[in-house]
Amino acid sequence: MMGQFLMSTRIYTGEASLEEIEHLGLKRAYIICDPFMEKCGRAGELAAMLNGAGAETRIFSEVVPDPSIEVVAKAIQGMKEFEPDGIIALGGGSAIDTAKAAGHLYGSMNGEGRPLLAAVPTTSGTGSEVTSFAVISDTKAQAKYALRDQALVPDAAFLDPRLTSSVPPAITADTGMDVLTHGLEAYVSAKADDFTDACAEKAIRLVWEYLERAVLDGSDME
């Protein structure tokens, strides 16, 4: 049986890895996040970092849980006005899915393709920063639509543990169990192969060894 393994996202990991975002060479960066990320200052800090590297920035902070068609449309309208050469998703799965869907549709509309897309996750568990999927909700029809396209895969992901150090212990535990579940699902998948097994086994082992420590002490960077 033929299989394939593709990982096209450039992943930056470790403390201070977010600082590498300055080297993306962006001139106009469009930051997508939820209201809390702007209120707590995370979005502003990211914007300042990009400004220091010579980029103009705009923050779209209207992301909601289970992102809706309406929110995606608003994000696209903001892109039309700002004309970014890069989109930065800051937050959890909802922010990343909003950025993926909006960026892809914006690129299709302008005829020039999607701008560079980078993900800066502030929680673990979804893995949306490296997948070709996005889920968007239709509030009127009370339905969810799963989008799948290779163009939805972010170009870069910044996994900086400093962004998760202040997450409440209960959230750390919940998202850690998400990681464990995804690892187990991948391992028993009918489409599993040697490459995916290696990733799944490592994920399971890391959760087993370190989740409790992370829950007890969010500042433990190991």
Language-model-derived ranges and their functions:
Residues 1-86:
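ATP/NTP phosphate-donor binding region
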Residues 22, 47, 58, 73-76, ...:
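Predominant activation on well-ordered alpha-helical scaffold segments within soluble catalytic domains
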Residues 48, 76-78, 105-106, 134-138:
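Short, hinge-like loop/turn segments at secondary-structure boundaries
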Residues 107-195, 203:
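A glycine/threonine-rich phosphate-anchoring loop and its flanking beta-alpha core
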Residues 190-222:
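Active-site segments that bind and position negatively charged phosphate/pyrophosphate groups
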